[in-house]
Amino acid sequence: SDLERHKIIKSFDDLKKKPEFMLIDVGAGAESSSMTFMASSDKIVVVITGEPTSFIDAYSLIKTSYLDYKMNNFGIIVNMASSPMQAKLNFDKFQSITQKFLDVNLKYVGQIPNSQKVRNSIISRQAVVSSTNNNIETKAFNELSSKLLLIETNKTGTIKFFDN
């Protein structure tokens, strides 16, 4: 319920030491619970693939965020990319579609390679990034982490995490 979600968000105000970052992973689509947590966050990152269903889900989420919560800044990560160039093409296509109808700012954050190493890390529940590896997966995640800070903050006027 809305009250339960509000209590969860406000419970973070009581932490003695505030975290520098907190990632909140919500399900695809514009469900009420997802929207409440997104509106309570400073920065929003949407993960897409090159598939039409992914574009539809992401567009729906961004449209609801924009129209109902006045959020207009979004970082975009392209998952399962066959190459950095293909990821950028997918982003450009999604941005073109989205900005045709919505006045939103989409920032390309980067891509997650479609690789066996990523799939194996998911199956084994082990990190794909290691300080000793200099592979395409590590490079991609390092790029993502450096660009996350560049996403513009949303000012929604709703309750926020760590809002005391």
What are the roles of these predicted feature ranges?
Residues 102-129, 141:
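Beta-strand-loop-alpha "switch" segments that mediate conformational coupling across diverse proteins
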Residues 1-17, 122-124:
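P-loop/Walker-type NTP enzyme "switch/lid" segment
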Residues 10-17, 117, 143, 147:
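Alpha-helical scaffold segments in soluble metabolic enzymes
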Residues 3, 89, 136-139:
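Conserved active-site and cofactor/substrate-binding residues in soluble primary-metabolism enzymes
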